[in-house]
Amino acid sequence: MRKIFIYAMWGFVFICIAAVAIVFTAIAKGKIGYVPPVEELENPNLKFATQVISEDGKLLGTWSLSKENRVYVGYEDLSPHLVHALVATEDVRFEDHSGIDARAFMRAVIKRGIFMQKHAGGGSTITQQLAKQFYSPTADNVMERLLQKPIEWVIAVKLERYYTKEEILTMYLNKFDFLNNAVGIKTAAKTYFAKDPKNLKIEEAATLIGMCKNPSLYNPRRFNERSRGRRNTVLDQMRKAGFLTQEECDSLQALPLVLKFQPVDHKDGLATYFREYLRGVMTARKPDRSDYRGWQMQKYYEDSLAWETNPLYGWCAKNKKKDGTNYNIYTCLLYTSP
């Protein structure tokens, strides 16, 4: 009887492993769910706002089609405190895995599935969370979410193949929605602390990273004490990971959570009339005589001359990307001089 039980148990394990292998193979081959092609993984759509920068390097403002106003920031312009806080809190073995952390996953399965511990922590890596942000719409029910999980695993493994760890961290922080129209870490740092990401203090970085668990629940503007508690949890995780000493952690946890909240709007900034004029010039199309009334012929000749002689006039229509499509003024980086 005991042998039969052992055989049955191992048979069940084998069937489960085979089923998982079949599911993952079907997902990887595109038979189940949507797995983006290589081209899409290599060029994810982050919808960054265009930055208008003066000749002396000052930011005049941005152009954006939405209220998100997401502005790109490179890895070199991120505070190391942000990176340390994110890795320590969300994925402590980030540097060691290839998209899936088997140890974290099994821990989550055992604690949540067997011991029913609601606060046992998740098993998703930073790369899996990035895959979810890019390609998983909000699930309507538990079964739909369960199907999304293995698809995210496959996408996460592919992302790890095409991007470095630094690039994955950068995309994650540029993609995340920190609420209050603060999408992306650069806008979030400006909105909550009135500074660039590279200048964030340890406790400020911990506050923003604390929002990654649940931005609505840990919104520092609405729930200061709750957000402070979450910040302190992040600081403690940084201590456990070796990024902070016990003394540093204790002193930072004692600090109040102080914001310099100032919503960022793409319509704000310097030289607003000039920026609007420049936008009109760069998005102009090649003049067509049929679009001009009889009394507008002088305007037609002026626009035609500008099209032929001014490289900025109609810049978006004149220039194309590597894929053959025209540039979009709302998704490119522009340097100009007022």
Each model region followed by its residue ranges:
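Conserved small/polar residues in nucleotide/adenosyl-binding loops
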Residues: Y335-P338
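Peptidoglycan glycan-strand catalytic modules in the bacterial/periplasmic cell-wall system
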Residues: L46-A49, I53-T245, S251, K267, ...
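Flexible loop and strand-edge segments within Gram-negative outer membrane beta-barrel domains
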Residues: P263-V264
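Terminal amphipathic helices with adjacent charged low-complexity linkers/tails
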Residues: C249-K260
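SIR2/sirtuin-family catalytic core signature
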Residues: D303-L312, K320
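N-terminal type II signal-anchor transmembrane helix
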Residues: M1-I53, G113
